[in-house]
Amino acid sequence: MPRRIVLSLAVAIAALLLGLVLLYAGYILMDAWMDLHAMPAAQTDTVDGNTISTVALEAKAAKVDSLSLDGAVMLDAMMDDLSSGGYTAACFDIKRADGTVGYASTLGTVAAAGAVSSPAGDLRSSCQKLGKNDLLVLGHIVCYPDNVQTAANPAWAVKSGKTAYTDPAGNRYLNPDSTEVYNYIRSLVEESVRAGVTVFVLEGTELPQAAGTFNHNGFADLSKRLTADLGQDVKFLQPVAVNITSTTTADLKKEVADKCTQNLNENQIYAITCPEKSRRAVKQLLDDRGCTCYLITE
């Protein structure tokens, strides 16, 4: 075979191989980009043409430690516990009542205040893994009680005279009328949404009467503003607090029947506090009553 033909074939084969390599690399990069930017499918679906913010949510949730969202061994153990207990959702702390943040936030305001504590180690991959196992992720935000940011940013605090208002238990509060406070809460939500969380339980939206009167106090106002800014694919739930103290079967049955009587709207969730040893029985009683949206914690 003439040398010119051999060289031409070699060049053609090399070009073909290079093209295949580049095509394969392109697919890998595209998959990586989609993993980085995609939201879990279970978190963004619509129901009968309605967005998640407008439908009644079915979530039988247990409160879990933020540390368990490590994307690895602790997450697997937590998912096993939820599945064996008949739960369909996990709820973790985004912002706690003391002002600490329960995930590895990169927000400058969080870092400057040193607010991160016992965080979820890998929130993004944990949300993806939970979604693949048909478990919904709920983010719990205690909105206005905050001893961390009120110390780091005194101008954000509710004032009593020239100093921060402090309740009898020593708690300070963020000012609901402050633009900076609203932007802070919104930033926490936005960052969590990017990691894969689309349902948020907003607690601590009402301030004590002694703290004063505010234009933007309350769940309805805050959730409306957040929905307007973030869109209809994010849902906000108002917790309806129920404290269960009984431990015997008969007493538990009566207490649950007496206290869980409210017909929840599409933006509410029962927030059940009960002794650890009663959790399984309380969950069964809620299921027997046809409750489909609740959060059980200790």
Segments from the language model and where they lie:
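Active-site-adjacent "subsite" loops/lids of carbohydrate-active enzymes
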Residues: 50-63, 144-190
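N-terminal Sec-pathway targeting helices
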Residues: 1-22
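Substrate-binding cleft of secreted/luminal carbohydrate-active enzymes
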Residues: 25-27, 31, 250-298
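N-terminal, intrinsically disordered, polar/charged segments of Gram-positive cell-envelope systems
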Residues: 31-60
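Aromatic-lined carbohydrate-recognition surfaces of secreted/lumenal glycan-active proteins
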Residues: 136-146, 201-203, 218-252, 273-275, ...
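Glycine-rich, aromatic-flanked loop segments that form ligand/cofactor-binding clefts
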Residues: 89-94, 119-165
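Catalytic domains of carbohydrate-active enzymes, especially glycoside hydrolases
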Residues: 73-101, 191-203, 258-271
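Aromatic-lined substrate-binding rim segments of carbohydrate-active enzymes
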Residues: 45, 96-141, 188, 207-234
